[in-house]
Amino acid sequence: MVLGIGMSRRRWALSASVALVAILVAGGAQAQSLSDSVRMTVQTNPKIVSQENNRSEVDSELRRARSLYLPQVDMRASLGPEYTENIFTPPGSNGQHIRQELSAVLTQKLYDGGATTAEVDHQLGRARSAAYRVAENAQYVGLDAVEAHLDVVRLRDVLALADKNVQAHADLVQRVQARSNGGAGTAASLNQALARYEAAQAERDQVRGDLADAEARYLTIVGQAPGTLEDPGVPAGQLPTDLDASIHIMRTNNPVVKAREADIDTAKAAVELADSRFDPKINLEVGGDHNHNVGGVPGRDNEARALVVLQWNLYAGGSDIHNREAAYAQVEQARTERLEALRKSEQDLRQAWAAYEAAEHRVPLLTSAAQHDSEVRTAYSDQYQLSQRSLLDLLDSQNDFFQAEINAENAKSQAVFQAYKILAIQGTLLQALNVPPPPQADPSTPTPRPIRPEGT
């Protein structure tokens, strides 16, 4: 068993040497910053790209609605045999002719009760809502990237601590073996040390598994495997002075709330569209016909016209009334959803602030506790050598020190994450990281016309 420990120590030393060489080789390469991780996520994450495509689709609907202001031109042509027998059929004719028709009509809306304007406003509201949903996904998927980045950094640090913990237990096994060989130790003490050593190895394996999961999640969110990652600190300069200031920023910038406000405008436009159904429709029609052999009459039959046409539905079974009632209900629903989104965002923001302040308070305490545990471990090691402390005391002090280091590391990472979560809920995460939002997140900027997909 002692030989096995010695081999383990040599393997650990070899691994440490390889890791050191890798660090030195990679030293010239710049660590990937948190901003880089979020920027790649915003550019490539499928959730965000899906919302960008939705914005493009809605913008196409907006262009379609605006085209309703323009005139419509229709042409019709026909050619074929016709048999006609009526009072206009010339004597001696068999009533068979080759009928030819050609007509063209230009129709321009003069009045439609505001239906076209309401449809444009409806699609404008949808476009604004779609833009804010792009911004929403960019903020919160960006926050997922922050969490994935921090988790990889944290677990790599924890793995380094676990390696040190395994080595410390290996050293203890060697010391107990040496005492046992000198007649000062027992087989029970050696077994106790070996059990703790193996438990430390198992804990390190667990950390390795957690790190592999974190790296896989990073790959899924960011779109590439994590290399050397920068360990970011708390963005203290980007945070508001207090919770009230943060809530004020959230009410102004949170994209979830702004999307719901756009939904209210969309629903109001639907009410105007429903109201327009009660008004007449007035169109200007300019057209002409160039025909031959129509209605059994041989020869030309030409016609030109310019008409003002009024069309008014006087009764539709009450469907227009029901449409208007449904539109009013949609407005109230949109207002309720906006209030719900605002309350939920404020709740999330308050919880994030509480978690951030708690983590910030815990970091110095846990760091100090780890330092004290380190001093206790050193003192117990000296006392154990003088037989003034038991092996159990020494093993427990090593475990306490290891757990204290992990607790301090976790608290530091949690404080950083909660700070960025505050920024995301405010709607200012990308701005704080100097990451440009997707162009589709700007409601004032129309998206370009989509390219025809391949295979269509």
Task: List each model region and its residues.
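Periplasmic alpha-helical coiled-coil/stalk elements that build and connect Gram-negative outer-membrane
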Residues: 2-8, 138-251, 263, 352-355, ...
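Acidic, low-complexity, intrinsically disordered peripheral segments
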Residues: 4, 83, 407-456
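Boundary at the C-terminal end of the N-terminal hydrophobic targeting segment
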Residues: 29-33
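Amphipathic alpha-helical coiled-coil scaffold segments and their short linker/junction regions
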Residues: 38-42, 190, 194, 224-287, ...
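Small/polar (Gly/Ser/Thr/Ala-rich) solvent-exposed segments
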Residues: 49, 72-96, 107-138, 258, ...
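Amphipathic alpha-helical coiled-coil segments
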Residues: 50-65, 137, 141-161, 171, ...
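Transmembrane beta-barrel architecture of outer-membrane proteins
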Residues: 99-101, 147, 192, 281, ...
